[in-house]
Regions:
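Class I (Rossmann-like) S-adenosyl-L-methionine-dependent methyltransferase catalytic domain
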Residues: 1-40, 44-46, 52-86, 90-102, ...
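A short acidic, Gly/Pro-enriched loop at the edge of an enzyme's catalytic core
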Residues: 102-110
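Short catalytic micro-motifs in class I SAM-dependent methyltransferases
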Residues: 114-118
Length: 247
C-alpha cells in the first residue's frame, strides 16, 4: 500500500489516486529538529521508516552519519533524489523494519517518525527486538507515534497504540523507557480530506466500526479547521518515547 501512495497510485480497487501524502510536509519534523538542537542525536544514526527522507536529509545537513531505511522502493527513490537535490550524503536502503538482517551492532541513535503505529502487535515486538540487535550498547531510540489525545480538538486519524502496550513491548525487548509523554506531529491536511464515500469498499471491509467512526469524526473536524489554515499544515496528537538500549 505505501509504495502505491509514494507513486501516486490508488491503494485499493475503486479508490481515487491519493491527493497527497499526509506526512509529506516538505521539511523535517519540528519536534525532531528540537531534539537535535538539544543534543539528543549522537553517533551513527538510523532513520527507520524514513518515508520521503526529510528527517534524514536534515540530520545529514547537520553533520551526522545517517542510514535511512524504508520498506517502500518508491520512497527510497524519492529520498535519494531529495538528498541529491540538497547535496548531502545519506545511505539509503529498502528494508523490512521487523527484520533488519545485516545491520547488527551498527547504530547509536534510532529515529522512528510515525512507523511504530503502522505495525501490529507481533510486528512491533519483532521490530523492537530487531532494533536491539541493530544498535550498540547504550543506544537511544526516539519513537514518535499516534496518541489517544488531541491537539485543540484534533484527534488521531487512525487508531493509536496504547501507552501500556508500548511500555510492555519496549521493556520486554531490551529497552528502558526514559520518557514517554505527549507531543505533536506536523501533517499535510490536503491529503486527509474527502468524505466517507472516498473510502473504497475493500478498505472499509478491513476496518472496524470503531475505526470508521473515528475517521468520520476526524474528517468532520477537518472540514471546520482546514479552511482556516494558510498552508494545509496541522499538528496531530502524538506520543514520544525516548528509550535506551539495555543488555
Amino acid at each position: 500500500m505505501f509504495d502505491k501512495i509514494y507513486r501516486g497510485e490508488p491503494t485499493f480497487e475503486g479508490a481515487p489516486p491519493p491527493t497527497g501524502i499526509p506526512w509529506d510536509v516538505g521539511q523535517a519534523q519540528p519536534r525532531l529538529m528540537e531534539l537535535e538542537a538539544l543534543g539528543g542525536i549522537t553517533g551513527e544514526v538510523l532513520d527507520i521508516g524514513c518515508g520521503l527522507g526529510e528527517n534524514a536529509v536534515f540530520l545529514a545537513s547537520r553533520g551526522y552519519s545517517v542510514t535511512a531505511l524504508d520498506g517502500s522502493p518508491a520512497a527510497i527513490e524519492r529520498s535519494r533524489a531529495r538528498a541529491a537535490e540538497v547535496g548531502v550524503a545519506v545511505t539509503f536502503g529498502v528494508a523490512d523494519a521487523t527484520d533488519l538482517t545485516g545491520y547488527d551492532g551498527r547504530f547509536d541513535t534510532v529515529v522512528d517518525s510515525a512507523l511504530y503505529h503502522c505495525l501490529d502487535d507481533d510486528g512491533r515486538r519483532a521490530y523492537a527486538n530487531g532494533l536491539h540487535r541493530a544498535t550498540r550498547p547504550d543506544a537511544r531510540w526516539h519513537l514518535y507515534c499516534f496518541s489517544e489525545g488531541n491537539v485543540n480538538g484534533v484527534i488521531s486519524p487512525m487508531r493509536s497504540v496504547s501507552e501500556d502496550n508500548t511500555r510492555d513491548t519496549l521493556t520486554s525487548s531490551g529497552w528502558r523507557i526514559d520518557f514517554l509523554g505527549p507531543t505533536t506531529y506536523l501533517a499535510n491536511t490536503a491529503a486527509l480530506g474527502g468524505d466517507d464515500t472516498s473510502i473504497p469498499e475493500q478498505m472499509r471491509q478491513m476496518m472496524s466500526a470503531e475505526q470508521l467512526e473515528q475517521m468520520a469524526d476526524v474528517r468532520s473536524r477537518f472540514e471546520t479547521i482546514v479552511p482556516m489554515l494558510d498552508d494545509d499544515r496541522l499538528h496531530l496528537p502524538f506520543t514520544v518515547v525516548h528509550a535506551s538500549r539495555v543488555d
